[in-house]
């Protein structure tokens, strides 16, 4: 059996590789907007330089893939980012990150070999895309009611739809996935509520651990 891994093809237009096989990414969007040190997001938060939209992927060591019998890196990594946002002081421009930041946590795998809930079969045309097993998703914000559970069918395209909704972009305008997404995640929060006070998450490792960690970076599996 061979391995057909086409994920890099999806960002080829952003990477603009310097060689047909291998090479470095030379595209301006990649060079200017892709930071290959995951912990830099923590210093960006602390320095009040967090980008309006940030896609944060941990190193392989701090991902939730089952490489070890006990893996505390992944949960601690997520907690460090949420805590950094929630505990960040008022920025010089008056911005309070906890009051205007939504943190969307999801995984690329479902964590097992079975799901008792069969995936919905989408009507054509869908190209080669259909739903698979469910994956976890957590929506963190000051305007999400505590312990809220949403039972609608969401998908990865819903994340794009949320960004479009939040920044006034025509919903469904970015790609195939968001155009066919069932939701835009707005059911997870109510902007008319007063922001809930942040409660620090207890974790065995904090932001300074990840910022100061000199362990060689490894790629997260499949990313």
Regions found by a protein language model. Name each.
Residues 1-223:
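N-terminal pro-sequences and low-complexity stem/linker regions of secreted or lumenal proteins
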